Amino acid sequence: MTAPDDTDRRLIAATQAGLPLDEAPYARIAAELGLTETQVITRLSILHAQGVIRRIAIAPNHYALGMIANGMSVWDVDDAQAEALGERIGALDFVTHCYLRPRAPVWRYNLFAMLHGQSRAEVEQKRAQVRALLGAACRADDILYSTRILKKTGLRLKDG
């Protein structure tokens, strides 16, 4: 993998907050950076193939869509099954983030999944679906509800 050059970094900086809402977003970015639309698309494709950019996707604001109940569900599952179970949970359409994390002496949970709903009752129903999917592999679970957004962004490269 080749490290991103200055042009790649400028391209990442120009797109990291999202693509412009435009009929031709890549052409608009190209004009801002002094590139052609083809160069922008090619560079983004290479950065994606190298794993520098994981994905380019629409990311709706779930709060604006009425999804105001958000909880990080945490699960204590057998370590030997955790990856396979995490993949199954991550495939659920109502799970937006799913992570394996190391346990800590005072924290038994190793599988985390973010659930969203229009109410806590809806999120609890989704939690019950995850619990049913995990079955006997789930030894314990909990949910940590968001109370306030302090910061919400993706990775940002510093200018310069």
From Swiss-Prot:
Catalytic reactions on record: siroheme + 2 H(+) = 12,18-didecarboxysiroheme + 2 CO2
Top-level class of the enzyme under EC nomenclature: lyase
EC nos: 4.1.1.111
Subunit structure: Forms a complex composed of NirDL, NirG and NirH. All proteins are required for the total conversion of siroheme to didecarboxysiroheme.
InterPro entries linked: AsnC_trans_reg2 (IPR040523), HTH-Siroheme_Decarb (IPR050684), NirdL-like_HTH (IPR053953)
Signal peptide positions (record): none
Listed name of the protein: Siroheme decarboxylase NirH subunit
Known function: Involved in heme d1 biosynthesis. Catalyzes the decarboxylation of siroheme into didecarboxysiroheme. Siroheme is probably decarboxylated to monodecarboxysiroheme, which is in turn decarboxylated to didecarboxysiroheme.
Pathway in which the depicted protein is active: Porphyrin-containing compound metabolism
Organism for this UniProt entry: Paracoccus pantotrophus
UniProt keywords, alphabetically: Lyase
One protein family per Pfam: NirdL-like_HTH
UniProt GO molecular function: lyase activity
Gene3D superfamilies (alphabetical): 3.30.70.3460
PANTHER family: SIROHEME DECARBOXYLASE NIRL SUBUNIT, TRANSCRIPTIONAL REGULATOR, ASNC FAMILY
Family indicated by similarity: Belongs to the Ahb/Nir family.
